[in-house]
Amino acid sequence: FPLVKAEWWERHQLLVSLAWALLFLVPFLFAYGAEATAEQLAEVIIGDYIPFIVLLMGLYVVAGGIHIGGTIAGTTRNNVIILLIGSFLASWVGTTGAAMLLIRPLLRANLWRRHRAHVVIFFIFLVANAGGCLTPLGDPPLFLGYLRGVPFFWTLEHIWPVLLVNVVLLIGLFVAVDRHFMRKEGRENYRQLELLTRADDRVPIHLQGWHNLFFLLIIIVGVILNGLIPQLGAFVDAETGRTFGVDVFGAHIGLEYVAQISLICLAMILSWLTTSTDDRSRNNFEWAPIAEVARLFIGIFVTMIPALAILRAHGGSLGLDSPLGFFWATGALSSFLDNSPTYVVFLTTAGALGTDAAGAVVTTIGTVDPSILLAISAGAVFMGAVTYIGNAPNFMVKSIAEGAGVKMPSFFGYIGWALAFLVPVFVVDSLLFF
C-alpha cells in the first residue's frame, strides 16, 4: 500500500493494520475459543506492544525537546563527527531519539551542498540502526529481548567488537563517498561553505532544552528496574516465583512492569510540560511519526502470534542451528519486515533449540546459545538498515530529509545503496564473528 497508493495509505493506516489483525483473530477465535484468544491477545498487547510503544514514545518526546543550535559547516570531518556522536548516543537514547536529535543539525550543516542524499543514507546506516546495538534502550528488538530475560548489559559485553568493525568500515566508506561528491560541488556552493566557516559570523554550538537529559536518565532507570526488580526477593511472591502483581487473561502485570511504564510516562509528561514550544518548534516536532508507528505495530504484533506459536512448537526442527544461519536469516527478514517482531521470532526459534553451551542465556522462552543470540541481535539491528521499512527511524529520517529539500533515493534506489555498502560489511561480519 505505501508504495502503490501512498495517499490512501496515509489516511487508512490504522484500518489496514486492524484488518490484518482481524484476519488472524477471527479464525483463531472460532478454532480455539474466546478464552484462548484473550490470553494470546493479552500476552502480546500487555506483554510486548504497550512497553514497546511507551518506550519509543518516551524517547521520541524527550529527545524532541532537546535542540542543538549553532553554526556547523558540513565538511567531511564535521559530518564524521556527527555520525560518530550519533552512533554512540543511539544505544543510550534509542535509535529514534538519536536520529531525531541529530538529523536536523546534520541537514542544516550540509545546506550548502547540492549532493546531500549520501550523508542522510549513511546517517540511517549508522545512527538509526547500527549504533543502537549495545543496550535494550538502543533498538526495539533488543528491548523485546530484554523483556524476555536477556540481561540488560549482555549485548554491551558481547556485541561491541562487531559494532566497532562496522563503524570503522562504514565511516571509511562514507569518507570516500563524501569526498567524491565534494569534488562535484560548484564554486557557488564552496562560497557558501566559506561563509559558514568565517569565524566572525559563527554562532557557537549550544544546547537548548538540556533539562531533558535528566528525563532521559529517568527512562533509563525505568528500563533497568524492569530487569532488576524480579531479582529482589522482597518483591517476589514465594508461592508463584513471580513479582507481586495481577494477571489479566494470563498476562502478568508485576511491579517491574508498573515501575517501568510509570517512570517512562512520568519522564514524557514532565518533558512535555517543561519544554518550551519554541524549543520543540525549532526541532519541527510533530506527533505524526510516532502515531504512525503506533498504528502499524498494533497489527504487526497481533499477526506475529501464530508465527511465534509455530516456532515454539517446531523451532528445533527448522534446520536453522548455526550462528551464521541465524545472522543472515534474521537479517534478511529484518530488512523487509520490521526488525522487532523478526527478532522475537528467531529468539523463539533459538529458545526451542535449547543448549548446554558455556555462557548460555536463560530467557523466558528457553535457554539460548550465546553465539546464536549474538547473531540474532546483530542481524536484527544491523540489517534493519537495508530498507526504509526495516526499522522505525529509517522512514522518519527520510521524511525529515525530504522536507528539508534533500532528494532521497526511491525505495529500491535506497536498497541499491545498501547492497553496495552494507552487504560487503555484513560479509566481513560473517567471516570475523559468525
What are these language model-derived features?
Residues 1, 20-30, 56-64, 86, ...:
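Hydrophobic core segments of alpha-helical transmembrane domains in multi-pass membrane transport
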Residues 3-7, 25-48, 60-74, 88-101, ...:
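Transmembrane alpha-helix boundary signature
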